[in-house]
């Protein structure tokens, strides 16, 4: 099996686990009797953990070796999942969350993804955007499947009351992580940076200022995204239109399928019109659709706008990953991916808190703020980087 297929296989298992665990972690925390503050601390620790561990990968990843870091992170993911399966103690949950290897999003963008992005960048430049497109499509499809399967334990418990509680089903995490680690152990040395390059020459050097500018812009996009996290959207649809969890589950399953399809299209599009153009010209109209959602007169119109946005909103993800890889030298790719991903996680926790405040002023204000900030991001990104030549040019 080729290195690309091995990475895709690990991504599929990870995304399934994240889709599965994101539902069960939320359900088990709700059943545990923890107050809202404690639950908020746990989820904030997940985001902070991703930022901290991504920075660590960026700083030391190349020196240690991509395969070693990759395997170690997968083992830690299994250990962290085991903690969530066996205890409800907040200090232990926070420590597990701070590893940065758990995610509430099937398409995680933490330290593991940073290493995968760097390894996939070894593909030829003409194929790179398509590879990243398929890589993200795998995550969306597997994550959607994991979320659907997560409803199984509760349904089966109605027939078999003796089945263990939702929390214990998280023990699937260490088994899945073991499968991932075995697959990762089969990666060849081709995914590593050139061994002839001295360690002191690795990490961010020539592209340091460029990556900092890019990370600052990515953080603006992530901050805006924090206003409209999935849980908030479900809450808003329920408050505005009375949509129940069953309906929204189907809606977000559809969202996952559309995002998978759009990732494949983005890979094809990036090879034809350019990565920066793909990022901006797909993302910009999606943000206009986002701002229109609170103006919808009916549930049907709001769902249609949400689905239409989903077809466009994630097309920038594979293009962004390929763009970062092409923008820097090969020895800088792990650091560049890690630092730009970390920048997104540092600011994202502020979004939900501010969304709750803005919703008190107007129910639809979070959508308008998020859409407006994202439009500013798109325009700023285009004008800041439209004349920057990529390393592969």
What name fits each language-model region?
Residues 26-27, 31, 143-164, 234-235, ...:
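Transmembrane alpha-helix termini and helix-breaking/packing motifs in multi-pass membrane transporters
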Residues 53-65, 154, 262-275, 359:
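Helix-to-loop junctions at the C-terminal end of transmembrane segments
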Residues 68-83, 277-292:
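Structural signature of the two symmetry-related core transmembrane helices
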Residues 102-124, 315-328:
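Intracellular juxtamembrane helix-capping segments at the cytosolic ends
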């Amino acid at each position: 099996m080729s290195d690309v297929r091995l990475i895709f296989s690990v991504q599929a298992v990870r995304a399934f686990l994240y889709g599965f665990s994101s539902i069960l972690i939320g359900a088990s925390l709700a059943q545990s009797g923890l107050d809202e503050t404690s639950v908020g601390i746990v989820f904030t620790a997940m985001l902070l953990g991703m930022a901290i561990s991504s920075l660590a990968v960026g700083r030391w990843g190349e020196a240690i070796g991509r395969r070693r870091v990759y395997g170690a992170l997968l083992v830690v993911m299994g250990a962290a999942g085991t903690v969530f399966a066996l205890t409800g103690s907040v200090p232990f949950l926070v420590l597990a969350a701070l590893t940065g290897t758990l995610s509430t999003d099937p398409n995680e963008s933490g330290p593991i993804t940073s290493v995968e992005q760097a390894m996939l960048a070894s593909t030829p430049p003409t194929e790179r955007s398509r590879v990243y497109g398929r890589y993200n499509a795998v995550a969306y499809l597997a994550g959607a499947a994991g979320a659907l399967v997560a409803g199984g334990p509760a349904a089966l418990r109605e027939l078999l009351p003796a089945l263990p509680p939702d929390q214990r089903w998280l023990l699937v995490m260490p088994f899945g992580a073991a499968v991932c680690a075995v697959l990762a152990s089969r990666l060849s040395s081709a995914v590593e940076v050139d061994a002839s390059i001295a360690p002191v020459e690795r990490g961010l050097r020539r592209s340091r200022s460029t990556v900092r500018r890019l990370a600052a812009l990515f953080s603006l996009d992530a901050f805006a995204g924090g206003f409209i996290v999935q849980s908030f959207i479900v809450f808003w649809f329920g408050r505005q239109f009375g949509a129940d969890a069953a309906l929204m589950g189907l809606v977000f399953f559809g969202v996952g399928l559309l995002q998978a399809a759009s990732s494949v299209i983005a890979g094809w599009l990036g090879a034809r019109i350019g990565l920066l153009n793909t990022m901006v010209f797909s993302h910009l109209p999606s943000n206009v659709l986002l701002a229109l959602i609170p103006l919808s007169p009916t549930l049907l119109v709001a769902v249609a706008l949400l689905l239409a946005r989903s077809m466009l909103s994630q097309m920038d993800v594979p293009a962004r990953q390929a763009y970062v890889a092409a923008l820097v030298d090969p020895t800088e790719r792990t650091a560049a991916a890690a630092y730009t991903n970390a920048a997104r996680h540092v600011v994202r926790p502020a979004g939900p808190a501010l969304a709750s405040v803005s919703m008190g002023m107007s129910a639809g204000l979070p959508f308008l703020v998020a859409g407006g900030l994202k439009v500013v991001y798109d325009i700023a990104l285009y004008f800041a980087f439209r004349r920057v030549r990529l390393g592969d040019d």
